[in-house]
Amino acid sequence: INTRQYAPGKSICFVVTRPRYREVFAASFEDRIVHHYIALRLTPLFEEIFSERTFNCRKGKGQLYGVNMLKEDIRQCSNNYTEDCYIMKLDLKGFFMSIDKKLLAEMVDRFIVKYYKGEDIDDLRYLCRVVILHSPEKNCERHSPLSYWEKLDKNKSLFTNGEGKGVAIGNLFAQIFANFLLNTLDWFIENEGIEHHGRYVDDFYCIHKDKEKLLALVPKVRELLAKLGLRLNEKKFYFQHYSKGVEFTGSIVKPGRVYTCNRTITNFIAAIRRLNKANNERKVLHAVCSINSYLGLLRHTNEYAMRRKVLNMIEPHIYKEY
């Protein structure tokens, strides 16, 4: 780093299959140290400019925080569910794979020059540029069958989405810089007079009493995203009266109550079935840990009856033998 000869090492690349096929890169241990070096210096500065309505990869926030914020936004905007208001949910198409590396590197560099006061500012600027512009697909070891990549769209893989585009899903800096990039969008929505809004990665909602105001926001958002090299996923546009509810970060939020989406319940049931089939203590312990995790998640939703129903699927011999 001191001699400006640092180059990221070989990454591990694989494809996860659930809930959908997705390409992931894992950086080498040495590179992760560099990622944390960057994060430790920039995260406190990013927190000072981030909107309070950005929920992912931030201390004290997360999926549950976002769901609770959405629930409260609906309650406030509808005046305790007594007045009409509307929910609009938008999504970005191929967000991580669409990020323009050069544009992101320039934005981060300008930010560092303006806000960072440390003596190692030159090192930080250098490392950020190297890390952002790095193409891990050119030096990686694949740990999944090649047939898995055939199931990915061309714009879902760094190998095929085009030169100079995309950041590796799985790296710490990708999450941090993605938030930084979309911070522009968060404040734009706020400045357009939408008080009730929130974002988790590339999934964001807006709530307002005037549905025409919400619809008028869409082309403005589309225009802003185009300047960042991004675009909306037109197939995931959602617009409804608040009484219809909305799905957000794996939960379904309705007036005064929250439910878990079907996929989570299906996975919960699968964990119960693994427990029933377990034939040794290790497998039982693994299944029980998974079940406890789902119970911890479901306790934050209005799912008491569902929890009882699923737990009743545990076969009696499990209690007797273990």
Model-predicted regions and their roles:
Residues 34, 63-66, 174, 178:
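Phosphate/oxyanion-binding active-site loops and adjacent basic polyanion-contact surfaces
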Residues 196-200, 206-280:
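Polymerase palm active-site segment centered on the conserved acidic dipeptide of motif C
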Residues 80-201, 205-222, 240, 284-311, ...:
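Conserved polymerase palm-domain catalytic core
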Residues 39-100:
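Active-site-proximal segment of RNA-dependent polymerases
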Residues 1, 7-8:
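A structured, charge-rich N-terminal accessory region that forms the first stable segment of a protein
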Residues 38, 70, 174, 250:
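A residue-level signal for conserved active-site and pocket-lining positions in enzyme catalytic cores
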Residues 18-27, 49-59, 88-93, 163-171:
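Short acidic, glycine/Ser/Thr-rich loop/turn "cap" segments at secondary-structure junctions
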